[in-house]
C-alpha cells in the first residue's frame, strides 16, 4: 500500500487498495463456501470446476449466486493471480477479467445493484501506475502480494470485523490526506461512535438505520458494530 501511495493521490490510493481488499475477500469467501458445499462429493472448488460434470458446476454456480450474491470461477480467484505473480507472469489482463467476472456474475440477480461498479475505480491502465506495462504489472503485483497477508478470519466467522476495520482504516487514511475536503464524505470515528450510541440507546433491536448525508458509509458501519 505504501508503494501505491508514493505514486498517486490519497483518493486514488484508497480506491485501488480497497478494491483489491474486497477482491481478496470475495475470492476467499466463495472458495470457502464452495469447498464446504462440495465436501460430501470429496472435491474442492477447483477440482469440481475442472471436472466434466456440467450439472454439478451449474448447481454450484446457482447456489453461490443465491447464497453469496455472486460467482467467480477458480481461474479468476485472488489466489490464482498470486500464483501467476509467483511465476513472474503478466497479471494485468487476467486481473482485469477477474474483476469484471465478479460484477458480471450479478447481472439480472438481486445483488446486481450491490455489485454494479464495485471495481469501476480501478484503472489498471492508469499512467499513475507506471510508464510501461512492465512497471504497472510490477507495482500492482507488489501491492497484491502485500495484501495477501491479510487474514479475514472467514473460518472463525470474524470477517465482518476485520473487513470493517480495513475499510475504516483506508477511509481514515484518505481523510488524513484529503484535508478539509474529507468532511464532505467522512465522519471521524469519534463522532460516528457518539452518534451510534445515541441511536441505539434504549433499543434492543434496530430494524433500519438511515444516514441522510451518507458518503463513505463509515457512520452506518460504526452503528452496525455498536
Across the structure, where does each feature detected by a protein language model lie?
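Conserved SAM-binding loop of SAM-dependent methyltransferases across substrates and taxa
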Residues: 216-226
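Conserved class I S-adenosyl-L-methionine
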Residues: 205-213
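Non-catalytic, mostly N-terminal accessory regions of nucleic-acid modification and defense proteins
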Residues: 1-204
